[in-house]
């Protein structure tokens, strides 16, 4: 399974250009002149001795992981003669998921237990982020053409951003630091990469006559950090972050995921659908491989409250890097998008990573009935995706 961050580089007039080592996509050259960066040699690799285990709880365990859930996990391990004092609970409820540090043979032993529903290796996930730090326009063309509103008029709704974190003190963002969380040991939710901050601005940058304005301006943003400053992290952290939203979020909240990988993850699909069943809405990037999104997770998750988003340019042409196919629900702008960035700055990026938060913003202000405005041109699958936004 190949995991990647779903942005590519945009070439634009810039004050400063930053190149960050990342996973990029072979066919990602698009209308923006997107740059290619050598893939991380570790991206997508299984982590030796680390497995995500999901089992059916024999008792009614609390939804939020606690000491009681941890004790139940240890009982399961002990039953098979396994000792893992560092086993980490990822989610709980009707089923419990945990990260087990065991050998491949021991993982097979757990898989044979009738109460165990799933055992899959934990994997490294990583990003692509080539960035131009750019001069800004308060109301950018992409937000104007998508449509925008007052996210701050819906303070009971939250945008949960699962990414590299958010620049917590960026003057153009309304970040709820109290609920923000890092799923990386020894790290805070503060962004050290820039990608998550860029997504946050597209969703909810303040309409304050500085910088840029988001689709749902002033929306409450929560940073759930699953990737480090180099843009690498673990699948298990992403699963844990979605479970955190399921526990702490509510119907009408919106989750943006601009991380994806080749293949499927049953653990990730399970927790996404559990949250979606509660009425939590998801905007998920389709991916940048120029292939069918059916081959990539979580873009291939199907649910009434999950929206997989392809990308187009300013002229309404399908971006050449964007994934396509029947699992894609809607298309949004994803080429040369200017938004917030690290250290109070602004930057221009391209990718389905940038398309997804346009839809997330609309979900916040309009609910799951997203307005559309025609269809994207030159969709490779022959069935043009509806364009998000408009009147």
Tell where the protein language model's regions lie, with residue ranges.
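C-terminal motif of bacterial Sec signal peptides marking the signal peptidase cleavage site
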Residues: 18-21
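Bacterial signal peptide processing site
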Residues: 23-26
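Inhibitory N-terminal propeptides of secreted protease zymogens
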Residues: 30-129, 251-253
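Protease zymogen maturation seam
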Residues: 36-38, 75-89, 95, 111-158, ...
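C-terminal subdomain of the subtilisin-like protease fold in secreted/lumenal serine endopeptidases
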Residues: 216, 241, 248-271, 278-280, ...
